Every structure is written in structure tokens, then in C-alpha cells.
Amino acid sequence: MKVKVLSLLVPALLVAGAANAAEVYNKDGNKLDLYGKVDGLHYFSDDKSVDGDQTYMRLGFKGETQVTDQLTGYGQWEYQIQGNAPESENNSWTRVAFAGLKFQDIGSFDYGRNYGVVYDVTSWTDVLPEFGGDTYGSDNFMQQRGNGFATYRNTDFFGLVDGLNFAVQYQGQNGSVSGENDPDFTGHGITNNGRKALRQNGDGVGGSITYDYEGFGVGAAVSSSKRTWDQNNTGLIGTGDRAETYTGGLKYDANNIYLAAQYTQTYNATRVGSLGWANKAQNFEAVAQYQFDFGLRPSVAYLQSKGKNLGVVAGRNYDDEDILKYVDVGATYYFNKNMSTYVDYKINLLDDNQFTRAAGINTDDIVALGLVYQF
């Protein structure tokens, strides 16, 4: 009986937000759940910048309040704290923090730090034991977590079509710290939460649509964001008025089998190490997993991001280059719903060459070994 329960629980545990959250309060239409995990994690690699302790923890809550029979308020917050640094360093940050209202079948609207709608599709392949989901990144326009997202979501198409979901999203500008890079000193591009150019974004809009039926899923998402002054005028590659993303994905999740693939094409939106962005990039991720009843979940995946027409890097002109390319082989063993251990081997297929060195892109293999407690 225990092994059968594990086979049912594990897919739920893979969903962001920890499906097995601890209920703290549930009374009079008010509900509060607490969730989190501690990952005792170690990397083994010839790349000394990542080799060693990578321990971290995450803690979050989800809350709901019943305003009326048809209106529900909700909020979520999630925080990450690194456990591999001395106490004198501040290595912690907010992953998500948003609040919203849900109007029964009409849909929901929320605002705050959240996931971009592109991730509605690309998240299907972001399920590896440790690695994966790195053909994009956080604070990368509307591709993953970011600030200032206003999101409308509709589930089951107004209650009329089971499994048909769509979302529309707007992201406000997150610009520079002080505008000191603007020679006109006009102040455009300055925001109260300024950051370096690689993490900035202008106003953006996006949308996604997904359909799930008996274990099969298909989805598509698009986004288009203005780029900031800093992003186009501080010597970074991949300049342009807008950053655009177009993605499509497929998945199968049934009978203990999980298969997923996504293809994304971006313009001025995929980061090239520390150098800037690819004028055009083609990103591909595919993963296959199987859940054994006794708790073992092996995983194999392939990920590639190829930059096109990159331009001049360190005095040399580059056309097409692989930004990321690796095979991932791993496995997770679930002792129960709260305790698991995993190993994940990232087999790096990139060559150590002038381009990867100039961009600061790692070309070494990494083996990750982790022991996880989650609630």
C-alpha cells in the first residue's frame, strides 16, 4: 500500500508550491498553508566556481479568504535562504510575492512578483532533480520569475471547457538604479527597484494558452517587452527596441510516465553569459521520467540554447554559437512525501573555446547530490 501511495504522491510534489503544504489555519472562510523545503546539496565539478556546498532552504505560505460566495482573495509568498555562506553575508531573496482576487468562473487577477506567462509552458520541462529550466532565467523579461506582473488567469475557459486555460499578463518597467548611464540625464529608465542591465526590462505584455486532456497537454505562449536605455547603450550585445519570446510545448503525464518538450524562439531576450543577449536564439528542452511504485524516479533530459548572429564579442565577430548544451541523467528516491534524495549528472556538451571563455559560460560537467526534507 505504501508504494502505491508514493506513486500517486510524487507527481503532486513536483508541482511548484509543494502540494503537501502544512495547513496552519482553516476557519470561517480563511485558510493559510505553510510550505517549504531544506536541500542539503553538494556539487562536484572541475569548475571551482560551483564545486562544493550548495545547501539552501525555501519557505513560503499560501493564503485564501472568502470575501463573498463568488469572490475569493488570495496571496502567496516564497523566500529562499542560502545555507552555504557565512552568517556575515546576506544570501537570501524573495522568489514570489503577490496578492489577488478570484471571481469564480470569470477568472483571477493578481499583482506582484510572480512567474511570467511564458513559464506556463516552459515549466513542463523544468522538472529535473536539480538542473534544467536554464535556457531562460529569473528577471529575464517575461520568461520566468520577475517583478511587477499583473496577471489575469482563466481556468477551464469560464467553466465551459475542462482543461482549457489561458492567461494575459502585463509587466511594468524595472529599470536602472540611478540613470547614471544616460548621458542626457533625463531620468528615463530610473525605477525605485533599479538593477543592472541584464536584469532590467521595459513595459511588456504576454499571453499563454494550454489544454490538458487525459494526460496529454499542449501549450503556447508569447511575450513582447520594451528594452531599456541601459540594455541598448552600455556595450552589451543583442540590442533592439523589443525583447520577444515565442514558445510551444507538449507533455504527457499518465501511467507513471512523464514526457515533455518545449521549443522557444527569442529575439533580444536570451542572455549570453555576461555579454548581453542573442539577437536571435533557438531554445529546446526535452525530458522523460518514470515513477516506480517503490519511490524511485529516474530522469533523462536534453537542453540546448543556440544563439544566432551574435555579433562582436571581445573584438571577434561571432555568428552562431551554442550558449547552453547538455544531457542530464538523474534519479530521485522518495522515502515518503516529506523526505527524498537525488543525484543529477549534467553532462556538458559545450566546448571550452574563445567564445565560452569571453562569455563566462561553464563548460565542465557537474554532479549534484542532494538530501531533501519538504513539507
Swiss-Prot record:
**Family from the record:** Belongs to the Gram-negative porin family.
Topology feature Periplasmic, residues: 28-29, 67-70, 104-105, 157-163, 213-215, 255-256, 293-294, 336-338
Please state the protein's primary subcellular location.
Answer: membrane
> What organism is this sequence from?
Escherichia coli O6:H1 (strain CFT073 / ATCC 700928 / UPEC)
Q: How does it sit in the membrane?
A: Multi-pass membrane protein
What is the name of this protein?
A: Outer membrane porin C
Can you name one GO molecular function term for this protein? porin activity
Q: Where in the cell is it found?
A: Cell outer membrane
Complexes and interactors: Homotrimer. Forms mixed heterotrimers with OmpF; other mixed heterotrimers are also probable. The N- and C-termini are two parts of the same strand. Extracellular loop 3 folds back into the lumen of the barrel forming a constriction zone that controls the pore size, while the trimer interface is formed by the packing of hydrophobic residues on the outer edges of beta strands 1 to 5 and further stabilized by extracellular loop 2 which reaches into the neighboring monomer.
* Transmembrane annotation, as ranges: 22-27, 30-44, 51-66, 71-82, 92-103, 106-113, 147-156, 164-172, 202-212, 216-226, 242-254, 257-267, 280-292, 295-309, 321-335, 339-348, 365-375
The entry's keywords: Cell outer membrane, Ion transport, Membrane, Porin, Signal, Transmembrane, Transmembrane beta strand, Transport
Classification via InterPro entries = Gram-neg_bact_OMP, Porin_dom_sf, Porin_gammaproteobac, Porin_Gram-ve, Porin_Gram-ve_CS
Extracellular face: residue ranges?
A: 45-50, 83-91, 114-146, 173-201, 227-241, 268-279, 310-320, 349-364
Name one process (GO BP) from the record: monoatomic ion transmembrane transport
The record's function comment reads:
Forms pores that allow passive diffusion of small molecules across the outer membrane, including some antibiotics. Variation of the residues in the constriction zone modifies the transverse electric field in the zone, altering antibiotic resistance. (Microbial infection) Is not susceptible to CdiA-EC536-mediated toxicity, which uses OmpC-OmpF heterotrimers of some strains as its outer membrane receptor. Mutagenesis of extracellular loops L4 or L5 of this protein confers susceptibility to the toxin.
Q: Write one Pfam family the protein is assigned to.
A: Porin_1
Q: What is the residue range of the signal peptide feature?
A: 1-21
Gene name of the record: ompC
* Protein's UniProt keywords contain Heme: no
Q: Which GO terms describe its cellular component?
A: cell outer membrane; pore complex
